């Protein structure tokens, strides 16, 4: 099995909350909590973040509002994993963070 995928979280500026689509996706957002993007990649997360910021296969919210990687939200998931595990955990992490009141975008 090929273990080179990662789940990563990006901290975004609260300015992303100006987007109605983002707000509608986060009806349980608790004001003051972080705005986050959760993704998965076959690249090193630092490289993937740099590509987002450069506009290469970028999520528009991350490109415009991404501040930094936020590994503290996935501290237990820093090791490479299979594509299938990363795909599952990307969704799982996003759901768990939303349940805790964070504003989360996961595509």
Annotate each PLM feature.
Residues 1-50, 84-93:
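GIY-YIG nuclease catalytic motif and its immediate N-terminal context
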Residues 43-46, 50-107:
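Aromatic/basic micro-patches that form nucleic-acid/chromatin recognition or nuclease catalytic surfaces
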């Amino acid at each position: 099995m090929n273990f080179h995928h990662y789940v990563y979280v990006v901290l975004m500026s609260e300015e992303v909350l100006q987007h109605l689509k983002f707000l509608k996706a986060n009806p349980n957002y608790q004001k003051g909590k972080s705005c986050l993007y959760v993704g998965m990649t076959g690249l090193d997360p630092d490289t993937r973040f740099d590509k987002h910021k450069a506009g290469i296969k970028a999520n528009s919210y991350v490109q415009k509002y991404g501040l930094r990687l936020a590994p503290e939200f996935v501290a237990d998931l820093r090791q490479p994993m299979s594509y299938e595990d990363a795909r599952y955990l990307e969704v799982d992490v996003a759901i768990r963070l939303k349940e805790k009141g964070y504003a989360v975008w996961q595509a």
